[in-house]
Each structure stands twice: as C-alpha cells, then as structure tokens.
C-alpha cells in the first residue's frame, strides 16, 4: 500500500527553519509572497502527483506533521491500512530526526526488541527531559516500528534536501544529491559494545561498529530534489496533508481548501 504525505510548506519558495518549540505563524512580510499560486498548486497536484477531483482519495488534513503518524496508526487499527507501507513524503523537511535526539535513542537496545514491544515505546529521555514523537522525527519512528517499507522524499528544491541523520544510512554511506533523483538506504543499527560513530570517525572504527552491529532491514530511501522529477499516477491508498502552522504563513491556508477538493476526508 502507498500513502501520500504532504506538507503545506512544500508550496513555498522560501523555507523556514523554525525551532520545533515555536508555535507562531510565519511573518507575512517575509514569507507571504513565497507561497505558490493556486494554479501552480493545482498543476502540481494533478500533473505531478496524478490527483484528480473526479477520483478523490480518502485522507485527512492535520495540523502538526507528526499527526500523520497517528492517522496511519488509526488506519492500521481499523484494518484500512496494512503495514509495512510505502510513503511518498512531499515536504520542505525530511522529518527523519535531524535536530532531534531520537536517532540515537532508536538506534539502541530497542532494536533487540520484538516489533510488538517496540511499538509500545512512545518516548525517550534526553538531557533529563522526556521527548516524544514530534514533527521532526515521526518518519524515523515509523521506520523503527517497521511500519514503512519504502520512503520517497520529494524535497523542496529550495531546501538542503539532505536534512536527515547521516548515521541512519546503511553502512554510513550516502549518495551525493545534485539535480537528479538519488537512491539511498536507511538501516537502523546497534552495537552494544561501541558508541555510535560520528561523521568524522575513522573508517576502521565505522567498519568495526558495523561488523558487530545488529541491523534492521534496509529501507529504500529515494530523494527527488526537483519538481520536474516528481511523477506519480495518483495511485495512493490514502492522503494526508499537514498545515504545519509554524512553518507557513496564515495566507497559505487556502491550500487546505484546495486539497479538500482532491480527498474524501475521513
């Protein structure tokens, strides 16, 4: 099964790097004019994603993007969605844990747990505080839960496109992102005898860590860095779009009305 996971901030020329804790809308003066026009948005939805008002897809509009994850859990519980499933993530941010501590927490003894036990873990401790699944790491949690079988990141061309945790890549390797789609692989790993390597660790240390690590199945991770290379036929089982109010100006809210024309809200 395949789900479309949209974020409203993809339809902007200027990308905000707002701290997760900030809840205010973006300033109209700086961000308002960067929002795509209605015609451009409709063209992308219909010509790039293959959506149609004549064959609407069940879905939901949410506020914070981590609510997409809870929507999927709801669908799984109701038997409407089966896992693992493919995710097409159209966003200005990868939401794979960069800027969070979750990649270290998830690449831990948790990987030794049965899947049923993993899925009961909803938070972790970092610097004396309890952190929960958030807007910046919910996809990484989905991978750790083995909910996601394949992930395609349709990245905003104006963003960095490699805003994920390097240490979650298979063999600590990533293909360079330029102007064409790139295929990487995410593979969570844990070696109880060694600390997780950092980017500048020696290759010998990285190889030793990998040799003694337990490893989750690899997940194909495709990054599409341009709008022109986004090509889908609309064959999605479900659609979810996040408003992401702290990453969009209020003037962008008309996008939600447009999306509603292409989905059957559930």
Language model region names:
Residues 2-266:
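Conserved alpha-helical scaffold segments that buttress catalytic/binding sites
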